[in-house]
């Protein structure tokens, strides 16, 4: 059985979603790698991405009744992942929000199935955690319960304090976060694939400087 986390990282490299080199993060840090989930932007890559999400969610063991995708990136993730979960025998409804409320038709900021039961939030990454916090407020305002958060990559980086954005969400809300892959998985990829050997030490140094346990 192959490691789907490694398969996901290799797939991300093939799609140029994951790149090695010298990049500057939003926090102003010099990073030896860059991950841009927005480049999963055609039917085939989105389908494969949704398969990875579905597998990661199932293996996480998180109990949930439906998916919620925060606008905008989470919208397609929720829809596509719901379809792939259905193929695996887990048929759940999904919903998403608008950035601005609509005053005609169905109105409001929520679209899709009513938010009920245990709601799993799905997004690409957790950076500042703003999207997750807003999603939790929406879910709780509808009388539903946040079940956890599914993301593509956990960079495992310290924020302003000693915790990463993912750890802060886990600590503040008591919610499990299920990434398809993490910085640890990326490190394993570099160790096991000599063609990426030149980036092993820069990633090791970056992890030592900014990483969390």
Curated annotation (Swiss-Prot):
Orotate binds at residues 34-35, 127, 155. Pathway: Pyrimidine metabolism; UMP biosynthesis via de novo pathway; UMP from orotate: step 1/2. Keywords: Glycosyltransferase, Magnesium, Pyrimidine biosynthesis, Transferase. InterPro entries: OPRT, Or_phspho_trans_dom, PRibTrfase_dom, PRTase-like. GO terms for molecular function: magnesium ion binding; orotate phosphoribosyltransferase activity. It holds the Pfam family Pribosyltran. Gene3D superfamilies: 3.40.50.2020. Its EC number is 2.4.2.10. Its cofactor is Mg(2+). NCBIfam families: pyrE. Belongs to the purine/pyrimidine phosphoribosyltransferase family. PyrE subfamily. This is Orotate phosphoribosyltransferase. It comes from Neisseria gonorrhoeae (strain ATCC 700825 / FA 1090). The gene is pyrE.
